[in-house]
Amino acid sequence: MNKAISDLSSHTPMMQQYWKLKNQHLDQLMFYRMGDFYEIFYEDAKKAAKLLDITLTARGQSAGQSIPMCGIPYHAAEGYLAKLVKLGESVVICEQIGDPATSKGPVDRQVVRIITPGTISDEALLDERRDNLIAAVLGDERLFGLAVLDITSGNFSVLEIKGWENLLAELERINPVELLIPDDWPQGLPAEKRRGARRRAPWDFERDSAHKSLCQQFSTQDLKGFGCENLTLAIGAAGCLLSYAKETQRTALPHLRSLRHERLDDTVILDAASRRNLELDTNLSGGRDNTLQSVMDRCQTAMGTRLLTRWLNRPLRDLTILQARQTSITCFLERYRFENLQPQLKEIGDIERILARIGLRNARPRDLARLRDALSALPELQQAMTDLEAPHLQQLAQTASTYPELADLLQRAIIDNPPAVIRDGGVLKTGYDAELDDLQSLSENAGQFLIDLEAREKARTGLANLKVGYNRVHGYFIELPSKQAEQAPADYIRRQTLKGAERFITPELKEFEDKALSAKSRALAREKMLYEALLEDLIGHLAPLQDTAAALAELDVLSNLAERALNLDLNCPRFVAEPCMRIEQGRHPVVEQVLSTPFVANDLALDDSTRMLVITGPNMGGKSTYMRQTALIVLLAHIGSFVPAASCELSLVDRIFTRIGSSDDLAGGRSTFMVEMSETANILHNATDKSLVLMDEVGRGTSTFDGLSLAWAAAECLAQLRAYTLFATHYFELTVLPESEPLVSNVHLNATEHNERIVFLHRVLPGPASQSYGLAVAQLAGVPGKVISRAKEHLQRLETTSLPHEQPRAKPGKPAVPQQSDMFASLPHPVLDELSKVKVDDMTPRQALDLLYTLQTRL
């Protein structure tokens, strides 16, 4: 990091100016505008050269020291900024604001913008499919206030959360690229370990000043209308976010219009492990392929894709909203109405982010062209929505209004294919502004004037070799060969002498030069002024335009879910008051799409008579797929979507937990088993009788007895909690749980062997598995044949010595547990087993002594 420089007297004037600005941004890279380049100095230069793979050089000396320097062309800055932002860096943009021609000493410069990962809005720096969120948190271990802002859409929300576990789960859900925390928090807290964590001064979180700034931003007297007046911690966090956004953008933020109070009670909570295991929008390798989002997303707009991702990551418990979405999807499916709407939506584009850039006053000409095209497409879109009877769709259609005046304004203002930036002009149409037209005409018609002037002067002077030209140094000129220069008329004023030629200027040419050269700069200045005025005009309509964008995004998601329902054979789930989870012919929506063979659908029934299924069967038999598909079906139902099942009936759940697969947490110093136990502990502490719990192979990472004991106790606890539980295990001993826990049942995934090869049937059947097929799976995996043969010998010996003599008795109506060897259990010695069955009271002393001698010979 750079160190602040307090004594600037020994530095050059340029470096004095640099350090006055740099001292205010020591922990951020500074791009310092020098002509056509952004130059980067000192420690910033060393860091940037390494990160951007550009040459590190030096720029003279200051204060007796060489100045490390690297630079990038200002017109190519976007690519470099994108790379730095992806690496988590923040960049201060320092521009020249003075005129080099009139400046005495260094040209005036000032910081015009600070680009941070959470406050970027440039299209080139953003992932169009993901929200770009920044969050701030305030509180202690008991209660936290969390504020979340998406500056690229204007979405601003607050909530209060109890405890670290819930806070970390929420941070995992929103996945902010920056997280602001108070500087007076102790070092090393869990939140600080997240990427993008930045400390801010404690007074940035002060409640009263935060309340005041929020009320000013939203033009309200208080925050009661947003339902968060009494959320002291959340208001403090929101105030910090607003301050940070203003600090980085250096402009007003008119697109931030309201604050939404979110409540965890309204949502189905998934912890970090569950989100990871279910691969909602990121797979276990960190990519997007073969995720739920990749299968469910055929949205026509980027803002629709982002909204769908938000829904998948925040399933709801509000029946009114869920049923309104179901009704909307059903309406779209009738007569395939979604097919009429989707092509129209595709014309809309990502106006949500375009409107945010307009609010930030950094919208580019192509943004306005896309907004023009979107507004022009709205009337036809409205026509496509006229026959939608669902009340929610009618409400969305009404909100997605038309804007004929704005569409006409942009049609008149912006050329069909504008340049990327306003910098060099050429954006506004001819006829939009008369003064601009005159200035551009004067500038653009200079060539014809020079042609006409040359012809007139040749005729007037009789000098056939006379030429009229222009260069950037000397401006316009009349050129004569040296031999003819003496014949120049008296009104020719010598301007430049060349080898073999003389150049002149005339009063007429000088007058034209003054007009033409200034016309271009004046035209560019006026075009920029008109462009800024156009942005201000659009800012005045931001509120309804943002409402329209939100309505169109939701229409996109709902029509997309209708298309998915049709093409993926999804059906509408039914929510009921009775506690239950009944799925007929359920399928895994992702696995089904990647299989080359038909997916085997399976049923599930959990209710007040059965709350837990103990699932046994071979590896690769489909246990994990069956469990995950249940969670995904339940989750899709709770976003209002149709689900991959022939039918589905369920009550609302409050949480979805998964304990499926673990790996070492090396950075945190935790083993695989420790990670597994931490996840299990979280489930046992927080699951309720409304939770869905998936437990896969609990207890694998320790000794057999320890693992079995922990798995058994955890299963008993969940059964007694009455959580909806799918408990997959290879501990065959757990199949006796139904004998002691009446809400537990056994099911298994079946398989068969043919010619010493295993065939997985993937069908879920009642009762426990009859055998594990472990050796067959090992053979399928390519374990050497001699190892398999030796394993069979060991297995035969273990089965001979370890089979229990008596199986537990089945309860009436429950299938008997089949006999299966337990290759890990340490069962009693046969002598001890026989001795335990002897009825000593029925024996004579002589019989007892004879038995003792007999048993002794068997030891």
From Swiss-Prot:
ATP binds at G617, P618, N619, M620, G621, G622, K623, S624. One of its GO terms (molecular function) is damaged DNA binding. GO terms for cellular component: cytosol. GO terms for biological process: mismatch repair. The gene is mutS. This is DNA mismatch repair protein MutS. Gene3D superfamilies: 1.10.1420.10, 6.10.140.430, DNA repair protein MutS, domain I, MutS, connector domain, P-loop containing nucleotide triphosphate hydrolases. Keywords: ATP-binding, DNA damage, DNA repair, DNA-binding, Nucleotide-binding. Belongs to the DNA mismatch repair MutS family. It comes from Pseudomonas savastanoi pv. phaseolicola (strain 1448A / Race 6). The keyword Transmembrane helix does not apply. Disulfide bonds: none annotated. This protein is involved in the repair of mismatches in DNA. It is possible that it carries out the mismatch recognition step. This protein has a weak ATPase activity.
